[in-house]
Amino acid sequence: MNKLLLFSVFSILTLNVMAQEKIVQTAGRDQLGTFAPKFAELNDDVLFGEVWSRTDKLGLRDRSLVTITSLISMGITDNSLVYHLQSAKKNGITRTEIAEIITHIGFYAGWPKAWAAFNLAKGVWSEDIVGEDAKTAFQREMI
């Protein structure tokens, strides 16, 4: 019982701290800094530094879900989708959930787009234990 109470308090405190963290992104400057400095600035400082950092309005997990859905729906299956799939996994979207999300998207955005997304998602979630979600594994580690 004490472990459960301690875990609950820790989770609440951690979520409050996480909600206040500013997302730091340098991919724009790293990849496009001298070629397209304004775009790099907007990517790093506005999109990630401001929009993604408004976690008090919409959490990172939900932002990841919206972003993945948008990219797949547009047929974007390049390194940007891989990056956002990796972020989604870090933000708590499980292997089971991503499979269901992509399946659902397939009916609305197109079957070939879902196939392409599955090929990338399999790589991101390849090391997950078969039949287990990241949440379950994380919860087991915390006990």
Language-model segments: what does each one mean?
Residues Q20-D62, V82, K90, A114-I143:
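Acidic, glycine/proline-rich low-complexity segments that act as flexible tails and inter-domain linkers
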Residues N79-T103:
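A cross-kingdom feature marking solvent-exposed beta-strand/loop segments within repeated
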Residues D62-I72, L81, I98-I102:
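Short, structured motif recognition centered on aromatic/hydrophobic residues
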Residues M74-N79, G110-K113:
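Short helix-coil transition sites and intra-membrane helix breaks within transmembrane domains
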Residues H104-I105, A109, A117:
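C-terminal binding/interaction regions
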Residues M1-L4:
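Positively charged n-region of N-terminal signal peptides that target proteins for export
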